[in-house]
Design a protein with these regions (language model features):
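Beta/alpha (TIM)-barrel catalytic core signal, keyed to glycine-rich beta->alpha loops juxtaposed to Asp/Glu
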Residues: 1-150
Length: 150
């Protein structure tokens, strides 16, 4: 990916994983050393428009997972991330918002993001995302607090 980003003929736009966990979860299975932040940094350096994906990291940054782990174990990293994200849920509660809304506000607040691609399953989730878009952006300090949780 970095080769394409740094090539003389660059992509018109890039989808980048943007979440406080800095995790691709189960979709990062092909490369254990995958680091979403390094991809995003290269995209920003090259001034490539960025579409944020995985804001709630397959449910890991929500109040509860909406499914059970698949028997094959292919999505285990998403469930591992859910457990890891407990401090994030604590901060969301302290700040008076749902974890999903806070995760979307985070993605919308990161400098260099052109748009956030949503993965919603119902109208309630969609409404929460629309509300997050209407809220003030997180401050740099709030962003750092969330990033430093992990």
């Amino acid at each position: 990916m970095l080769t394409a980003i740094n090539h003389e003929v660059q992509p018109e736009a890039m989808q980048c994983i943007i979440n406080p966990l800095n995790s691709a979860g189960a979709i990062g299975y092909a490369d254990q050393a995958y680091n979403p932040s390094s991809i995003f940094e290269a995209v920003c350096k090259n001034k490539i428009p960025t579409l944020a994906i995985r804001a709630v990291q397959a449910g890991a940054l929500t109040s509860s997972m909406d499914r059970k782990p698949h028997e094959s174990g292919y999505d285990q990293l998403d469930f591992d991330d859910y457990l890891k994200a407990e401090p994030f849920r604590d901060i969301a509660k302290e700040w008076g918002v749902s974890p999903a809304k806070l995760a979307h506000r985070y993605a919308l607040s990161v400098s260099g993001i052109s748009s956030v691609i949503l993965g919603v399953k119902n109208r309630k989730e969609l409404n929460e995302c629309v509300e997050a878009e209407g809220d003030e952006k997180l401050t740099d300090e709030e962003i750092k607090i969330l990033q430093n949780l992990f």
